[in-house]
Amino acid sequence: MQIPKYENKPFKPPRRVGSNKYTQLKPTATAVTTAPISKAKVTVNLKRSISAGPTLNLAKKPNNLSSNENTRYFTIMYRKPTTKKHKTWSGDGYATLKASSDKLCFYNEAGKFLGSSMLPSDSDSLFETLFKAGSNEVQLDYELKENAEIRSAKEALSQNMGNPNPPTTSTTETVPSTKNDGGKYQMPLSQLFSLNTVKRFKSVTKQTNEHMTTVPKTSQNSKAKKYYPVFDVNKIDNPIVMNKNAAAEVDVIVDPLLGKFLRPHQREGVKFMYDCLMGLARPTIENPDIDCTTKSLVLENDSDISGCLLADDMGLGKTLMSITLIWTLIRQTPFASKVSCSQSGIPLTGLCKKILVVCPVTLIGNWKREFGKWLNLSRIGVLTLSSRNSPDMDKMAVRNFLKVQRTYQVLIIGYEKLLSVSEELEKNKHLIDMLVCDEGHRLKNGASKILNTLKSLDIRRKLLLTGTPIQNDLNEFFTIIDFINPGILGSFASFKRRFIIPITRARDTANRYNEELLEKGEERSKEMIEITKRFILRRTNAILEKYLPPKTDIILFCKPYSQQILAFKDILQGARLDFGRLTFSSSLGLITLLKKVCNSPGLVGSDPYYKSHIKDTQSQDSYSRSLNSGKLRVLMTLLEGIRKGTKEKVVVVSNYTQTLDIIENLMNMAGMSHCRLDGSIPAKQRDSIVTSFNRNPAIFGFLLSAKSGGVGLNLVGASRLILFDNDWNPSVDLQAMSRIHRDGQKKPCFIYRLVTTGCIDEKILQRQLMKNSLSQKFLGDSEMRNKESSNDDLFNKEDLKDLFSVHTDTKSNTHDLICSCDGLGEEIEYPETNQQQNTVELRKRSTTTWTSALDLQKKMNEAATNDDAKKSQYIRQCLVHYKHIDPARQDELFDEVITDSFTDLKDSITFAFVKPGEICLREQ
């Protein structure tokens, strides 16, 4: 309305309607038209709102809901103005633009008008321009082109702006039908601004449930909001659709950004983990060869399960599978009605908002790189605590991570750092939706502070990743399982009574012929397998054969030096062993000392067991001067052959830093460039060392400590690895050997294991070959285990005594146990034996009521012979597909490096087992 310039004149009262002194204005197309006030009277052109009379509409809100086909529709994002560095949008909505106008009108997702803004002068920058609309900043997202999208936008806007119900306060006034001669509607100025309020009718009776109309359920359901998944399954090639329960409202579909990279076993793994964390029962799959990942099955709930143990072998992509699961749960949820959704019914948030990843400190950088590699850190916020932070800074960072919603979704923290920030995590534990524990076998100790801290957080959804969760201790197995799914195995007392005692008795060599105990142990084992297979997934790296380059495994038996033989004899005589009281624990120090002699006699003098129990000064001096050994000679010859004969890099692994010191000195003397990673290297430097080795072609070797640095590292820059010594725990060696043969490797790989012939090295190797039987049994490697392999402890006290014997008259004690071939490089086929039948027969005969002394002695001899035969059978099964090679008869070892070096090594290598890698085409 235009107000005339004020003039100081005497007051004149306004004239009544009907006066002929009003000024007539020509009607226009606008909703409200006013005329300048002349002599305190106004002429107004009114728009009829009802047929009873003219109305005046003072609302200036633009209405772009007309059926004009020239109107363009856009989706928008809006927010309040902010000075934050990382800005986020607070909501979505629509914008309309009429062809006859240069003004954009903005609405939120509910159709509420936000404001309008003029078009920018440069039409090319339309979608980059930040518009000002009321108190909001608005940016166009994209223009709606599809008819269905435009129709949906019109419906969303009309729900609010086209509401037929009258508002409680009306801005439209009904004017009496009073006409003058000219057909104009006129009113005094005072009446123009005194608007009446239309009040809603209020019933005099109180409305109760009895008076309310009952709406049929079918009608209610028809009006219920429909929800849709984040991704359209029809637009994705080979989608991964998660299973669901009956209460699910939408399908959860893996983001194709990640799904297109997943291999078949990884697709199955992601779906298995999702089922476990969502508490779904395992589906019944009739044909496991059929791909079921593209279909969503409706499963029943399993209230006992809320966690998962992914126990795949190293190199199968556990990290990628975990990242896929994390991203899926952050972005999506099957229960759309419980989260905020877009106006089209698509969930805007996922089931999990904050996820805690706990791992060894050496893997923190690797986890963050993997998130960046697969998702890009602009899509997901990943927080890692800097090693330069003070404890207070770490606590503040954790506090902010939990309380600030949109900046970070994932916190990656080391196991040790977890203890220092446990108080902050405990205070806000209700905000943590999911826990991921990498290298989860570190939690096998029930008294561990780290384990108790994680338990106190009481996070329902848990995912544990490990390559070797169990070896031969059911107590540790219970600790891990009870942490993942508390109470699923009952209390420890009941678990011990029902499972540990029967299974342990069945594995005791003293009860090997007791049919009743063995049957009960087998029954309990099967029962435990049925329970744990609901949430444990275990696959071997045999799956990788068609994805990775071929790998050749070579076991080299190295002849000990004479100085080493003398050291063995002196130590065993000086130890004065009492084999009657000998146990594995009491002899552990002596075992470690003998292992050092296998590496180099020069390590004897600094050994604590040698100093406290033997301490022969004269012998110690002679040992310290003798640094060489059979394995060191073979090692240096191999390194020289690799450097001169190939352009490849090599990793050398040992369990002892003192051994690495000796190897490092020898490499320096030979002019071999190298880097080293062991427990003394600060965590913040480890990633840079690994990256430098993988990328710098000038670095030839990498010295690696198996225990402190052999977990989770990616050393694909090397294609050859030499395992210098063995560990009692086969998982340590397997972890170390898998550093090079993994995703990202482009060259054929060669793994060399060095073993001192006839010494404790061989005994450890034999135990490693058989120690996996319990893991294979409870983790489902059924195709790799013999039914009898888990019924016995493979080493008893007699075997322990044999550890301290040195066989100087053999080329390979291991080969002597399993085979009598000539070592001509052939792969030996072993016929099926009737060993199991003989064992059952001995059991039946041992359960008779009375036995004479002569028969007892005869049965004991038969039992001893049977035990040796069983041990040989187990080792043969572990060495299947290996070729037996005697260097004196055959000089082809299926590796050009060692074959070319045979001239120098014929006197140092006594025997070899070789498993050649088959050429596998990498799946495109």
From Swiss-Prot:
Catalytic reactions on record: ATP + H2O = ADP + phosphate + H(+)
Bias (Low complexity): 168-178
The enzyme's E.C. designation: 5.99.1.-, 3.6.4.12
UniProt keyword terms in alphabetical order: ATP-binding, DNA damage, DNA recombination, DNA repair, DNA-binding, Helicase, Hydrolase, Isomerase, Isopeptide bond, Meiosis, Nucleotide-binding, Nucleus, Topoisomerase, Ubl conjugation
An annotated GO BP: reciprocal meiotic recombination
Function: Involved in the recombinational repair of double-strand breaks (DSB) in DNA during mitosis and meiosis. Has DNA dependent ATPase activity. Promotes D-loop (displacement loop) formation with RAD51 recombinase. Modifies the topology of double-stranded DNA during the D-loop reaction to facilitate the invasion of the homologous duplex molecule by the initiating single-stranded DNA substrate. Required for adaptation from G2/M checkpoint arrest induced by a double strand break, by participating in monitoring the extent of single-stranded DNA produced by resection of DNA ends.
Identification of the protein by name: DNA repair and recombination protein RDH54
Natural source organism: Saccharomyces cerevisiae (strain RM11-1a)
Name of the gene: RDH54
